[in-house]
Each structure stands twice: as C-alpha cells, then as structure tokens.
C-alpha cells in the first residue's frame, strides 16, 4: 500500500467505481485512506476543514462515496456523520437523530455503517439501535426508522410475558428483554434496494435481507430444499454446532456486497468464511477461514468486490486479502450469464464443464434443468432438477409435461370427458329401452 503508518484496526472499505479508488476507514488511526486501482495510497484524510476550523475524525467505523465523489464518514465517537470532499473540506455535519424512541439517559449515538441513495437520503446502521436502520434526508434531518427486524412470538416469549404479570418492578428489571436484533451492516444496490445483514437472529434465519422502499424483506428464496433440518433462508454455515463448553457457535455476518450480476457476497466473522449466493439465495461458493496461512484471516471485518476480485479486510492484521476468480468460478458465471441472456443451448456446455470438475455442484444440475425447461424438454428437466434437489423446479417441469401431454391429446381428453358425462344418462336410457323391448316380446 505504501503507508508509512500501517492500518490499525480498520473497520470498513468502499470501492468507488467512478474514480476506481478504494476508501478505507482506518478506525484506530482516525483517518480515511484512499487507494488507487493498483492499491497504492493516493490520499490520506486525517484532518477536516470546517469553515476555517481544523477538526478530526474520532474512530470512524464506516465510509461511503456517492456518485459525485462526496465522501460520507460514520464518525463514530464524535457521534455524527461527516460529509466531505477528497481534500477534507467539510460539506455537511449530521448529528444524532431526534426521536422519542431513542430518548434515554443510556443512549449514545454511535453510527457504524452507512449508504446514501441517489436522492441524497442517508441510511445509517448505529450501535444499540434496535428499531431498524436510521434514515436521514439530505439535510441531515431524521425521517424514520427503516426495515426493522421483528421479534417472533415463541413459547419462551409468551411464558416470559405471563410471568411479568406476577412480578415486582425489581424482578422485571432483572429479566431478559426481548428486542429486535440490530443490523450489522448494509449495502445499496444500483436499483435502490438496501441489502442488510444481521449478525445474529432469533431463529438463525433471514440473516441476509433485501429491503424495499416500504421496509419489507423481498429477497427471493427458491426453497428447493426446505425441510425440517434445512431452510434456504438460513444463510451461512449449517447446522449450528456446540463447543465443548456447550456454547452455540453460529454464523455471524459482519458485512456484505451485492454486484450488478445479482450475486450476494457475505462475510462471516465467526469462522472467517466468505459466502456467495445468487439472487434466489442459492449458495454458490464458500472460501476463506480463520488462520495464519494464505487465504485466511485473523479478524475479518469488511468485504468488497472490484470487477471479479473479492477483497476482505482484516482489522487485526491491518491487511487486505484479494481473491482472484478461478477458471471454475469463471465457467459457472459464464453459464449463468448465458442463461440470463436467453442463450439456453449455449449455457449447457459450460454447465457440463462445471460438472466434470465437480459432480456435486447442485447449481449446475439446476442450471441444466432450467435450460431444458426453456427448450420444453421436460423429462430431461425433471431428471436434472432431481439431481440438483430442486423440488420446485421438478414440480414445475412435471406440471409442464402434463400440460404438454394434455395439449397433444386434447381431442381424446374431450371425448373421454363427454363419455364420462353422458354415461349417467345413456346407460339408464339403454336399460329402459331394453326393458321396453323385452316387454313387447313378452306380450307375444
């Protein structure tokens, strides 16, 4: 990087496509470090010019750069958001939100992560704010809470609420408080959706969300393996396992990235692993880990993507690890891109190449199943969906196969239906006629 003073406990990084620069929140050095496309230092913002007065950051945890190049910094210990230019000239200072929900003696506004939409609205993830993401207008006025996590009603929660009725105030104060889990990070897509991660959830589900303007989670989940022991909206490692001390060890997402191709890259702090999902929550790849060898981390804290490279920031080491796309990964993404472009036949060859390298790659089987679906070869589609454990795809292919059979045998089906309808009328009529004829013969 070419830094005289190395990074010290950095907490965030952001890649700005327009300038092709990487911005790093060097937290314990209280500065913003800017790197060029060769990862060399081009600027260090360690002081601010605010109307002639010199100010500084205090443990900035988050950084974001809008399309115009304005830099937004979550100046955590100063309890504010700073908007400045590359030279450190302050363009705006936005302090704590004004909300009755946050009015308490114990509350301290500590913004951690942030994004800014095309209209200048600022979305902030703050520590110990359980009501959701904080939304400010372009002037820094608090607007609303956004996309709050819910507390699910469980038997334990109902039992606790019943007990509270019979307890004193002192006893109630010592009980656990059930509050929504706070988000740990957020990312803004080009289409204006906010993707957010929660480090822990109540039932270890929905750790990754795609939040629309109404605050609803609209992330697609193609639940081809939803069972009692596995759910597609359970992101990260599964199943949960226990250490020797009986402690639950679960995935704890600390950051995520969403790219133009529709892939979500999420970083797990617990095991130091990187998870890549497609836009239907299908798991594509897992890599990384905790350790000292190449490709592992001590305490990962942020993930970013530049073209096909995935970057992971390690706060303890003060270093960035760059993962290059392999030939296998390139073939997978090529197949998906061809399918998305409607080139179903062309997509089959790279999927077959993927399976030659990894016959357990379910996404490839499902990709072939989708290609055969588009070519109306439903028997083959069912075969590959079955290999890929895609129940929904298999069911859709079976329905289409039945619909195709029905169209091809429409005339026979109509005749069969007419016969079925007419039988109750024709049979009694024939029997009645037979009886009449028998009566005529008997009279002779």
Predicted segments, located by residue:
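Eukaryotic scaffold repeat domains enriched in small/polar residues
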Residues: 1-378, 388-389, 395-428, 433-444
């Amino acid at each position: 990087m070419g830094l005289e003073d190395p990074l010290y406990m950095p907490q965030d990084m952001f890649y700005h496509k327009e300038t092709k620069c990487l911005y790093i929140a060097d937290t314990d050095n209280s500065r913003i470090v800017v790197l060029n496309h060769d990862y060399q230092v081009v600027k260090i913002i360690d002081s601010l010019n605010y109307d002639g007065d010199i100010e500084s950051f205090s443990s900035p945890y988050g950084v974001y750069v809008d399309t115009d190049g304005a830099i937004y910094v979550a100046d955590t210990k100063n309890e504010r958001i700073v908007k400045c230019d590359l030279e450190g000239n302050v363009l705006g200072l936005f302090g704590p939100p004004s909300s009755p929900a946050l009015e308490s003696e114990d509350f301290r506004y500590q913004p951690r992560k942030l994004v800014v939409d095309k209209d200048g609205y600022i979305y902030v993830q703050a520590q110990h704010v359980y009501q959701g993401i904080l939304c400010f207008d372009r002037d820094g006025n608090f607007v609303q809470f956004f996309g709050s996590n819910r507390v699910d009603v469980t038997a334990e929660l109902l039992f606790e609420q019943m007990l509270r009725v019979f307890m004193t105030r002192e006893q109630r104060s010592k009980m656990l408080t059930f509050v929504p889990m706070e988000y740990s990070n957020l990312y803004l897509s080009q289409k204006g959706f906010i993707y957010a991660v929660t480090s822990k959830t109540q039932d270890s589900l929905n750790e990754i969300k795609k939040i629309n303007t109404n605050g609803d989670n609209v992330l697609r989940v193609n639940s081809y393996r939803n069972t009692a022991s596995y759910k597609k909206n359970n992101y990260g490692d599964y199943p949960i396992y226990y250490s020797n001390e009986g402690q639950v060890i679960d995935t704890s997402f600390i950051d995520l990235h969403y790219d133009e191709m529709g892939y979500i890259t999420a970083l797990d702090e617990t095991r130091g692993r990187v998870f890549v999902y497609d836009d239907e929550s299908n798991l594509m790849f897992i890599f990384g880990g905790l350790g000292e060898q190449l490709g592992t981390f001590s305490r990962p804290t942020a993930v970013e993507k530049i073209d096909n490279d995935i970057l992971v920031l390690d706060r303890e080491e003060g270093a960035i690890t760059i993962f290059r796309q392999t030939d296998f990964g390139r073939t997978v993404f090529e197949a998906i891109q061809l399918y998305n472009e409607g080139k179903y036949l062309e997509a089959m060859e790279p999927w077959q190449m993927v399976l030659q390298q990894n016959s357990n790659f379910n996404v490839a089987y499902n990709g072939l199943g989708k290609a055969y679906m588009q070519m109306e070869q439903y028997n083959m589609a069912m075969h590959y969906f079955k290999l890929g454990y895609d129940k929904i795809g298999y069911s859709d292919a079976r329905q289409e196969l039945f619909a195709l059979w029905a169209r091809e045998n429409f005339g026979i089906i109509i005749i069969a239906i007419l016969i079925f309808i007419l039988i109750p009328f024709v049979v009694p009529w024939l029997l009645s006629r037979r009886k009449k004829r028998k009566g005529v013969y008997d009279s002779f």
